Amino acid sequence: MMRRLMLVGAFVFVATTGQAAEAIEGNWKTASGETAIIAECGGAYCVTLKTGQHAGKQIGRLAGSDGRYTGEITDPAADKTYSGSGAVDGNSLKMKGCVLKVLCKSQTWTRL
């Protein structure tokens, strides 16, 4: 149950070393082995599962710019929504999801 909690976070901080922000858009392999796509949708970024039991379900929505995004993610198995944080670093997306901002877990997704 908790492994899906971290699917996508609320803040995506991108390392700023004078380079352009790393894109969050694309296909990602989740920690549980499913494939998710993060794509632009209506001025935000939507997270949709492409594989697994909940394939086709939108499980998150992020808004923001300049490498910082806020949003929510839903655990499709429990039908609960969480907030969190994350960071894109090359081909890795480190996610941290929290309940009431105190009970947090993290996981890393890999860009496909």
For the regions a language model picked out, list residue spans one by one.
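Positively charged n-region of N-terminal signal peptides that target proteins for export
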Residues: 1-4
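Sec/Tat signal peptide C-region and signal peptidase I cleavage site
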Residues: 13-21
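Central antiparallel beta-sheet cores of small beta-barrel/beta-sandwich binding domains
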Residues: 22-85
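Short, exposed beta-strand-loop hairpins at the edges of beta-sheets
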Residues: 85-106
